[in-house]
């Protein structure tokens, strides 16, 4: 399971011209599910996202996690994160989970995060438009 996290001052995801999810300060989490993923990996990644220290403290050092910074999460499914780009000029998605497994683990990841923080979401498998203001910019690739 892969999470591309971006520290944002605002982020929004629209589906069919309507806002599906919107946050102020927090993390935009683009989430990709691989075929070998399971709930244990989703738990591990959720804990990592929630506890990863990417927000500045009083000395402007990255010592605070999203909860300590009183931020929110916007979680958006993005299967292209699991692409194999090592060969040729076209990505391969053979590492990706089936749509059923990906949807199940995407929803599970969101439920685990919602136990500890406010979470907004996109719509699984939809064509979405994501807008954000990346703060820093600060972007990290996390895997479980």
UniProtKB/Swiss-Prot annotation:
Query: Which GO terms label this protein's molecular function in UniProt?
Result: D-tyrosyl-tRNA(Tyr) deacylase activity; Gly-tRNA(Ala) deacylase activity; Ser(Gly)-tRNA(Ala) hydrolase activity; tRNA binding
Give one Pfam hit by family name.
Tyr_Deacylase
Cellular-component GO terms for this entry: cytoplasm
What is this enzyme's EC?
A: 3.1.1.96
Sequence motif Gly-cisPro motif, important for rejection of L-amino acids, residues: 136-137
Protein location: Cytoplasm
Main subcellular location of this protein, as a coarse class: cytoplasm
Domain comment from the record reads as follows:
A Gly-cisPro motif from one monomer fits into the active site of the other monomer to allow specific chiral rejection of L-amino acids.
Q: What is this protein called?
A: D-aminoacyl-tRNA deacylase
Query: Which lineage?
Result: Bacteria, Pseudomonadati, Pseudomonadota, Gammaproteobacteria, Pasteurellales
């Amino acid at each position: 399971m892969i999470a591309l996290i971006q520290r944002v001052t605002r982020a929004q995801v629209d589906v069919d011209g309507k806002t599906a999810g919107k946050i102020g300060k927090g993390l935009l989490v683009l989430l990709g599910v691989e075929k070998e993923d399971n709930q244990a990996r989703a738990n591990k990644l959720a804990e990592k996202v929630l506890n990863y220290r990417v927000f500045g403290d009083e000395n402007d050092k990255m010592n605070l996690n999203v909860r300590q910074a009183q931020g929110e999460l916007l979680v958006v499914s993005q299967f292209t994160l699991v692409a194999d780009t090592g060969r040729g000029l076209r990505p391969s998605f053979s590492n990706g989970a089936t749509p059923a497994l990906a949807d199940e683990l995407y929803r599970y990841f969101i439920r685990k995060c919602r136990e500890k923080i406010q979470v907004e979401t996109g719509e699984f498998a939809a064509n979405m438009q994501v807008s954000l203001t990346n703060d820093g910019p600060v972007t990290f690739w996390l895997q479980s």
